[in-house]
Each structure stands twice: as structure tokens, then as C-alpha cells.
Amino acid sequence: MDNPSVNVIALPTFTRNIRTLIKKYRNILNDIQPIVAQLENGETPGDRVAGIGYPIFKLRVKNSDNQKGKSGGYRLIYYLKTNDQIFLLTLYSKSEQDDVVAGDLKDIIEEYARSNP
């Protein structure tokens, strides 16, 4: 039985994060590709972020350019909009940034919804 394919969409914030991080971490696209493949296969890895009102998940991604394991890796945050549509919200290096504020994630979703009715 085939798994339903999920449409994974990188929001502008996520794309900007990639452009910034790729300058320092050349293998970032290879590092996140397995996660994107999991999402496209309908899996929802990571921990749900509480207190936002949206089904948002945060997970650790190993940074192969940084030999500190997952704790020195990236945090990828995505929004499970529907069962067949996932939005990649943001991506950051844990060694360069603390946790993202829940309100910022909500703002990213609402800004995208306003500009794409």
C-alpha cells in the first residue's frame, strides 16, 4: 500500500534561514533532506510545541559540518497545516541561537496566511 504524499512547502522565513546558514554550513541541504523526505512520507517527527494553538513541531537535525552531535545541530520547526500539507517555518543553528519564541512562530503562520489567502 502506497503512503500518501504530503506537500512540504518552505515558507519565506525558512528559505531566508537556509540562505544565511548555507554560507557557514555547506552541508545543510544534505542534513535536512532526510527530514523533508520523512515529512513527505507522512511522518511527523519531533516534539509538539505547546501553547501556540497550531500543530507545530520542533526537531533536532544533526549538523554534519559541526562535530557536536544533535545538540550542536539545527532546530527545524514545521507546521502541520493539514494531513497532506506541511509548512517548514524556520531553521536555526542551536549553537548560534536560543529557542524561538512561540509568538514568533504564530506570527510567521499568520503573516503567510494574510499574504496567501
Describe the role of every protein-language-model region.
Residues 58, 73-81, 85-91:
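Short, hydrophobic/aromatic-rich beta-strand segments within well-structured domains
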